[in-house]
């Protein structure tokens, strides 16, 4: 009679999230008819990506042995991860007959697939995305051998559900009996659906779409663009929200999206590869599956078409410029050979040159330029269009000479900076002396570049953090990373920039860099809010320092030049625009 009071729980799609080789969490997903779960071909551990869609075994950093071990450990249970997302487990309290059925029929088969996949990956011929496609094919593509496992399991759980309905206790009250019948009929329906080969074919097809699109995204985007994509979207997605930071902080996992199979397959048939790539990119940026319908697909297709037209116009424009340059070169050669008509040729060349300048100014907006801290204005701008910031003295300090900086830090209150060598100070000045970024931060376009990285309390003050993806070129080297801005509000409510630096990082570590918890732990302890602050719009560099800020369509640059020879670029910081969300 113990069974009478048992709590039955039937999970139609994902019952278990596998992290490494252990069951860590049970959860349920609400799916509409026709929806499917797609897995993205990126392996995460905690906040960070440890394998991209294009990552092969030979690409893994051998110096970071723990990273290689994490990937291989995750692959050891990859088939269980896929099964639990796409098919699910039947979990019944106080009765393990469905679990026994799974263990007897599917467990060994799934383990074999994971083991074979791990061996294939370690040979180095397949990327992770290609491996994921292969595993889906092996698990769900029916043939005489493989199809039998799923069909046998479906038949077995159907039979067990029937037996349980027939064996239901006679003294069970009517309401409880109806509940049991609903649950058990649901299990029967699930088992019977395993015979639907079209369902499995569709599942394979959808995963191929995701894997192919992610491969193209990884191959087409530059490193800094990929960093922007991952920082902006995928690491804030569904699984992280469902399980929480603590649950996945040291676990391997895949992110997913629930989407209408009909909409996605229809989009591929109607629009093709470029639109599918953009759709998947929007998913990675955080677009929810329920928001992706036919109307949204058409909107994305329109954006892609317009982008292609712009590229074609740009190519056509460049071709015209090349032809014009060739004509100029020919005119000059003819002018040298002829002794007559020289002045006319020069006059024609001058007219041609003048026309070119007019066309260029019409096509390209004139960038705002700041030289040596004094802005050279190219157009009127109301004060209301700019945000007001103050700069804390600890940030202003970095504009001084290394010797002066060291002297001030050594007698200051921040222990982390005391006793640093002059060489260390010089290195740190390169990544901290970037106050020109405030020109962008104050502008109306700031939100197109900076993303909100959260707030936290520390040292008695509430602090806000913003980050932007960037690249720093110095000493013949190019480093990708993020521009970090930390602020608190003074007594008047004005944001004070107390932290400003370029932090070199990679795609694999971008999660920790933007994670609020990690930032709070490493943030400076106490900031003296009474120290000298300066209005950002009044800030100028010391005499003799030369830099320019140039704002373009997709980037903002700060260029430091040699004061003695301004043709020589000493350092360049590029801040990139955030990915476009449609």
Curated annotation (Swiss-Prot):
Residues 330-339 have a biased composition (Basic residues). Residues 326-386 are annotated as: Disordered. This is UPF0329 protein ECU07_0070. It comes from the Eukaryota. Residues 344-354 have a biased composition (Basic and acidic residues). Belongs to the UPF0329 family. It comes from Encephalitozoon cuniculi (strain GB-M1) (Microsporidian parasite). InterPro entries: DUF3654, UPF0329. Signal peptide: none annotated. Coiled coil: none annotated. It holds the Pfam family DUF3654.
